[in-house]
């Protein structure tokens, strides 16, 4: 069986950082200008620099991200998107700096981080030409698409621009027209996209209430900037994203910039000046000359999120393995390998490699050395270190792909490992010679383990029917044999330590569950625990035995029991596995346990241990009964050891091998596992491993025709300039975007985030009356039986009506604030007192208590679907039904069932 506990895979550590000039500033994001100054985001904070370049000065300092600054038309105020109070909201500050003013109070969006594919919520887009209002994009009513809103610069209730959806935008000089995008794809890691969501630039006329597509191009045409009679925008119609210009008089489009290495990113304009990102630098361009000029910027920063720090290794454990004597553990945590005592002693970090990802450490069964995987060379290789310490020995060299995992032979002489090329390799520890035993065209050999005599391997491989088949491999013959057939999916095989059985899980229990909506079925919990009797001479442990035993036989049994127990230990140490393949598929017996999902097997021939039904269990083959060993805990056993390692929650426990329910006792002390995290080295490693992950795992070897080595070189030069994890994620996202592949995302990792403070929502549309109180314009109808699909104002007994006024919240008159939602900050799901009145006054108001919603998207979506059902029903005279399926996951299936069956009368 696997002799380690695998908790999760963590991609960590790094390659040496590239050198950089001390005063050079790069990865400068989201620039804006007033013509004289440029404000940009660097490491999540806003900085200001003269438009001619020079030393930048920090304007903000906060754990959250400040981004998308936009100067007011008079150049005196900066509007920006920030996370000061937890939510991503719109703020303003004087151009000279100072305390930010919060302008909006909207809903907490669970998907509004900078690295999310939908982008941040409440992105500041522009100002109205008169400088009175700020335009921003909000996703309060739609988790994916956004709508454009305006808000007064001093704050207040926002007003929607009458467009169904919107993104980046820019007003015409007279303010009567708006050039805008409908879609927001700027944060997706998918370049060169030409599908149905490829954006165009549209012009909306507020006077005529018309829209016009001015690009109508299959490529991405985004971020319009209206200057005089020209609209500048980005397009990747020539592959690399560059600036183009459309003349509103001649209707002609021309290319302006001609960058070929890096895309032009996130331009903005003010007056006649355009500023933009390219390759992490900021450029400016006069709209008249149309000649870009790099702005040389220097800055100094404490780089607080890139500084080294000490982390508790116990929070990052990915694997643990018990020494054969049961006295020490080797634990992998955050890419480091620790050797620590089970009870008392010294905890040692035996790798100390912040620039490498070390993992899967295991003790050798003889207890003399430790083997682990590391990518210190830039490729994953196997390493060995003496258990008492000393130099690391590299066991494999010049590996060409990712090593998935490995297993040591019980005699400690060999290591079997698998890789991303679906090879199963055998390493001779003494000679370091590697032999490829097989390469599977369908997928990797899974769960490879040795027989107790080190002469056989067992594993599963995927058959042509997509079912997994159990195999054994004879190392002397260099030949594999199937042990199960194609008719049932089987997994997780291990040899019993006495060499008599092969224990595995198999899906052979067919107990369908039938649906309530139609005569259909689904199969769950199909797996059971099975034994293959390897030798013809091995009887089934479930043969019925005669209960009548003579006194003489019973006495003889007592006299020989001690000898049998003594000789059993010797047999286990020298168990020779004998396999008769003739009729082997007919020598399969099932343990009488409830069907479920099983794995992590261990058997000494008398008992079978396994994970299943929420914990570790044991089946006694002699007593023929099952006992719970440890609920919620998984178990790992070393060959020949009397000790076992349990993992439960975040704790590790070591006990004797239990015969029944285990007493876990006190957990192992993990508090001395301290890791010195060097973020620059760690981030360099993460970048490199991300690149290798696509090199080794992309579905096409030609990488969509991309020179993947050149792509790495192109973006690797940016990595030393990363000062936050979000910077690194952006670089990796740009790199994988070159593959022009959908659903290729970056796991955000450890991102510094402020605590979210959820704003309570009412499931209603409101306006501000001239009295200063807030009027209920519309209460969204919903499903009365669902709390998430109804407005709290529709709760029976509250009887709120459209046209009524909310005159106070928790005792605070609403006419005393600019935005009523400022009184609902932190009130999501919290009982809240509101005063309702048919008149805009406190006198005569009635008191009621509601629990505001956390989000309104579900309610808006529900109303949208209901409206569409009514429209289709009316247009077809009741003959056609309407179903909206949001995705192909559980929610999509639920929505189909929810709306399909009730409309079978259509």
Where in this protein do the model-derived segments appear?
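A flexible loop/linker signature enriched in serine peptidases of the S9 family
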Residues: 22, 41-47, 61-66, 79-91, ...
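Extended, small/polar residue-biased N-terminal targeting/export presequences
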Residues: 720-775, 842-850, 854-862, 866
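Blade-terminus and WD-like Trp-Asp/Gly-His loop motifs, strongest in beta-propeller folds
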Residues: 32-35, 69-77, 125-133, 169-177, ...
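Terminal targeting/pro-maturation regions of precursor/exported proteins
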Residues: 666-739, 743, 785
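Beta-strand-rich domains and repeat architectures in extracellular enzymes and scaffolds
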Residues: 22-49, 316-335, 592-609, 613
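A short helix->beta-strand "capping" segment at the edge of beta-propeller domains
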Residues: 22-28, 54-56, 301-317, 577-594
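Cleft-lining beta-strand/loop regions that shape enzyme active-site pockets
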Residues: 786-793, 807, 812-906
């Amino acid at each position: 069986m696997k002799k380690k506990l695998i908790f999760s895979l963590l991609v960590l550590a790094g390659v040496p950082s590239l050198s950089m000039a001390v005063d050079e500033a790069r990865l400068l994001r989201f620039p804006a200008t007033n013509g004289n100054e440029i404000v940009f985001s660097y490491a999540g904070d806003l900085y200001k620099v003269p438009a001619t370049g020079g030393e930048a000065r920090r304007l903000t300092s906060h754990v959250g991200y400040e981004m998308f600054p936009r100067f007011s038309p008079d150049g005196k105020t900066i509007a920006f998107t920030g996370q000061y109070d937890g939510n991503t909201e719109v703020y303003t500050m004087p151009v000279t700096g100072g305390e930010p003013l919060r302008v909006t109070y909207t809903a907490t969006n669970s998907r509004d981080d900078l690295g999310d594919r939908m982008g941040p919520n409440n992105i500041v887009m522009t100002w109205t030409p008169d400088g009175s209002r700020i335009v921003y994009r909000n996703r309060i009513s739609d988790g994916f698409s956004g709508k454009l809103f305006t808000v007064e610069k001093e704050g207040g209730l926002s007003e929607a621009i009458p467009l169904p959806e919107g993104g980046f935008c820019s007003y015409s000089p007279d303010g009567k027209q708006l050039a805008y995008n409908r879609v927001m794809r700027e944060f997706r890691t998918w370049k060169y996209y030409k599908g149905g969501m490829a954006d165009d630039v549209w012009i909306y006329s507020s006077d005529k209430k018309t829209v016009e597509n001015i690009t109508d191009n299959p490529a991405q045409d985004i971020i319009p900037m209206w200057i005089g009679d020209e609209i500048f925008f980005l397009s990747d119609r020539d592959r690399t994203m560059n600036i183009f210009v459309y003349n509103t008089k001649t209707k002609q489009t021309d290319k302006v910039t001609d960058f070929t290495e890096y895309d032009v990113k996130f331009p903005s304009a003010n007056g006649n000046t355009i500023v933009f990102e390219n390759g992490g630098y900021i450029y400016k361009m006069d709209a008249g000359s149309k000649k870009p000029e790099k702005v040389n910027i220097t800055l100094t920063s404490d780089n607080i999120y890139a500084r080294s720090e000490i982390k508790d290794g116990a929070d990052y454990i990915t694997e643990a393995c018990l020494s054969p004597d049961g006295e020490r553990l080797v634990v992998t945590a955050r890419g480091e390998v620790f050797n620590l005592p089970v009870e008392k002693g010294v905890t040692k970090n035996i790798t100390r490699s912040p620039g490498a990802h070390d993992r899967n450490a295991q003790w050798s069964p003889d207890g003399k050395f430790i083997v682990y995987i590391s990518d210190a060379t830039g490729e994953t290789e196997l390493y060995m270190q003496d258990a008492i310490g000393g130099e690391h020995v590299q066991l494999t060299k010049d590996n060409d792909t990712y090593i998935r995992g490995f297993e040591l032979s019980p005699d400690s002489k060999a290591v079997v490992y698998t890789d991303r090329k679906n090879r199963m390799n055998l390493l001779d520890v003494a000679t370091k010679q590697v032999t490829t035993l097989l390469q599977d065209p369908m997928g990797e050999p899974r769960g490879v383990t040795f027989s107790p005599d080190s002469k056989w391997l067992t594993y599963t491989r995927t058959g042509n029917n997509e079912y997994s088949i159990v195999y054994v491999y004879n190392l002397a013959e260099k030949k594999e044999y199937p042990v199960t057939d194609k008719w049932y999916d089987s997994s997780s095989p291990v040899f019993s330590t006495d060499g008599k059985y092969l224990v595995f899980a198999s899906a052979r229990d067919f107990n369908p569950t039938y649906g309530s909506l139609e005569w259909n079925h689904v199969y769950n919990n199909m797996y059971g625990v099975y034994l293959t009797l390897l030798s013809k001479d091995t009887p089934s442990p479930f043969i019925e035995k005669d209960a009548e035993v003579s006194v003489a036989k019973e006495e003889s049994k007592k006299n020989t029991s001690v000898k049998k127990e003594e000789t059993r230990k010797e047999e286990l140490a020298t168990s020779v596995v004998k396999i008769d393949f003739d009729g082997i598929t007919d020598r399969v017996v099932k343990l009488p346990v409830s069907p479920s999902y099983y794995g992590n097997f261990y058997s000494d021939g008398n008992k079978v241990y396994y994970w299943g039904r929420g914990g570790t269990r044991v089946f006694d083959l002699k007593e023929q009964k099952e006992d719970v060993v440890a609920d919620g805990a998984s178990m790992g056993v070393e060959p020949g050891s009397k000790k076992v390692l349990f993992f439960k929650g975040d704790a590790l426990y070591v006990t004797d091998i239990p015969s029944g329910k285990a007493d876990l006792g006190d957990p192992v002390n993990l508090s001395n596992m301290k890791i010195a995290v060097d973020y620059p080295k760690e981030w360099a490693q993460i970048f490199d491993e991300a690149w290798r992950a696509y090199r080794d795992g992309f579905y096409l070897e030609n990488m969509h025709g991309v020179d993947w080595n050149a792509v790495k070189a192109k973006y690797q030069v940016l990595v030393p300039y990363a000062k936050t994890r979000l910077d690194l994620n952006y670089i990796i996202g740009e790199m994988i975007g070159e593959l022009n592949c959908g659903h290729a995302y970056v796991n955000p990792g450890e991102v510094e985030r402020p605590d979210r403070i959820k704003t309570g929502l009412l499931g209603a549309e409101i306006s501000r009356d001239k009295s200063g109180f807030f009027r209920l314009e519309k209460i969204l109808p919903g499903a009365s039986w669902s709390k998430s699909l109804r407005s709290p104002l529709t709760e029976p007994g509250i009887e709120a009506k459209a046209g009524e006024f909310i005159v106070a919240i928790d005792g605070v008159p609403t006419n005393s604030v600019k935005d009523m939602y400022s009184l609902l900050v932190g009130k999501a799901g919290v009982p809240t007192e509101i005063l309702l009145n048919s008149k805009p006054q406190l006198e005569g108001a009635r008191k009621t208590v509601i629990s505001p919603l956390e989000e309104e998207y579900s309610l808006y979506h529900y109303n949208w679907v209901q409206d569409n059902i009514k429209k289709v029903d009316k247009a077809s005279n009741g003959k056609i039904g309407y179903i909206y399926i949001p995705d192909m996951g559980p929610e999509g299936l639920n929505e189909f069932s929810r709306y399909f069956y009730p409309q079978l009368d259509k």
